[in-house]
Design a protein with these regions (language model features):
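Sec-dependent N-terminal signal peptides
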Residues: 3-16
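Extended low-complexity, serine/threonine- and proline-enriched intrinsically disordered segments
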Residues: 77-97
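Solvent-exposed serine/threonine-rich low-complexity stretches and specific carbohydrate-binding patches
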Residues: 98-108
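Compositionally biased low-complexity segments at domain edges in trafficked proteins
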Residues: 160-178
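Short acidic/polar inter-strand loop motif in beta-rich domains
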Residues: 134-149
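Aromatic sugar-binding surface patches on proteins
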Residues: 108-117
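Short, compositionally biased P/S/T/A/G/V-rich stretches that sit at domain boundaries
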Residues: 18-53
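Short amphipathic, basic-aromatic surface patches that mediate peripheral association
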Residues: 57-78
Length: 178
C-alpha cells in the first residue's frame, strides 16, 4: 500500500512540474537568474502578446535577490526590476532562430518574472540553443544613491549573457495548464 501511495504522489508531482529549468546563474551583487521553458498561457493585454494558440512555450527568466550575501537593505528573494532581458532561441538542426524581448509578468505561481509566449523556430521535438542576454537598467530607468555608488559602482549589475545547448522543449509544448 505504501508503494502505491508513493507512486501516486510521484505521478501527481510530475504532472504539476510544468516548467523546464534551462539554467540557473548567480551574479554579483547577489542576483539569481533561473531560466525556464514553461507551459504557454493566456497573457494580457492581448494586443501586446501572441495568442496562446499561436505559440508553443512560455519562455521566462525568474530574477530575484539571493537569500544570502546580498547588499544591505535588500529584500531576500525579492524580484529584481528594471532589467532588459532578451533571448535568442536557435534550432540546432536548421539554424533558424527567433529573437524575444522578455517583459515583466506577474502570476500566482512565480509572482513577478520576465517572460513571453513564443513559437519555436522549428519542430517541438527539435533541440535548441538558447541565449539569454541581460542588460542592466539605464540611468533613466534606475537612479542610484551615493551609498550604492560607493559600495557597488555605477550600475545595478554588469551586462551578462548565458547560453545553453541541446534544450528539449517537447514535453513542455505538449503540456497544458490546469
Amino acid at each position: 500500500m505504501k508503494k502505491i501511495l508513493l507512486i501516486v504522489l510521484l505521478l501527481n508531482f510530475m504532472c504539476l512540474a510544468q516548467e523546464l529549468v534551462i539554467g540557473e546563474e548567480r551574479v554579483e551583487p547577489g542576483i539569481v537568474f533561473i531560466f525556464e521553458g514553461a507551459v504557454k498561457d493566456h497573457i494580457m493585454p492581448m494586443g501586446m502578446h501572441l495568442d496562446e494558440d499561436q505559440t508553443h512555450i512560455h519562455i521566462e527568466a525568474r530574477v530575484n535577490w539571493d537569500e544570502i550575501n546580498i547588499p544591505e537593505g535588500t529584500p531576500r528573494g525579492g524580484f529584481v526590476p528594471y532589467l532588459h532581458i532578451t533571448a535568442i532561441v536557435k534550432n540546432q538542426k536548421t539554424g533558424l532562430q527567433t529573437f524575444i524581448d522578455l517583459l515583466p509578468h506577474i502570476n500566482l505561481v512565480d509572482n513577478f518574472h520576465y517572460a513571453r509566449n513564443i513559437s519555436l523556430p522549428g519542430g517541438i521535438d527539435d533541440l535548441y540553443s538558447v541565449t539569454f542576454n541581460i542588460v542592466p537598467p539605464t540611468h533613466i530607468d534606475l537612479a542610484l544613491h551615493k551609498d550604492w555608488l560607493n559600495s557597488y559602482g555605477e550600475a545595478l549589475l554588469k551586462g551578462q549573457s548565458f547560453s545553453y545547448k541541446s534544450v528539449y522543449f517537447g514535453e513542455i509544448c505538449r503540456a497544458r495548464r490546469n
